Amino acid sequence: MAKIIEVNNVSKTFGKGENINQVLNGASMSVEQGEFVSLMGASGSGKSTLLYLIGGLDRRFDGNISVCGQDIGSLKDKALSDLRLKNMGFVFQFYNLVMNLNVQDNILLPQTMNGKKKSELKGALDEILEITGLTEKRKAMPNTLSGGQQQRVAIARAVLGNPSIILADEPTGNLDSTSTEEIMELFRKLNQEKGMTILQVTHSEACAEYGTRIIRLEDGKTVG
């Protein structure tokens, strides 16, 4: 299969002068289209930093990162924004829902903000509501939902545009064990049935095992 993510000799530091912190030090890895990869490592090992670099949320780094055949570091802002909108869905530990919008409007928000009409998105919305088990909650407000349900809304929002890649940063970090299992089963379903490539950062071995492969970060380098 084609490599959809390629990271080559990437280094990243924070701070200046005597306070420089080397988070990544020549990290290299690749993810093939259709894989479900878990990125693991000790706290502070640079897992989330690497995920953010891959997603183009931070472009100050040394080395090369390619996503969907495009060099993240050389893209202009508009081209990077277009790449993210078309090919990437982001899921974070915190759900970041708009509390005065109902479930379906939260899911639609990124697409409508980029000029899509709700009528154009109806079929995709109905499908993703069914996949995420939120059909009966489409008119519910976020404050009436459990943490697991709110994270499902966040996932639905991330995948409504049918991205090639889901980048998930500790997506179950705030959830109980039952909700964690439900969310991980949902990711597996999106990977196996929708063919979405998933790269998740997790500290949980149990969550990592839902994926097809584990990459570990040690001393700023990737192993495995």
What are these regions (language model features)?
Residues 214-224:
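H-loop (His-switch) and adjacent beta-strand-loop-beta switch element
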Residues 3-214:
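ABC family nucleotide-binding domain
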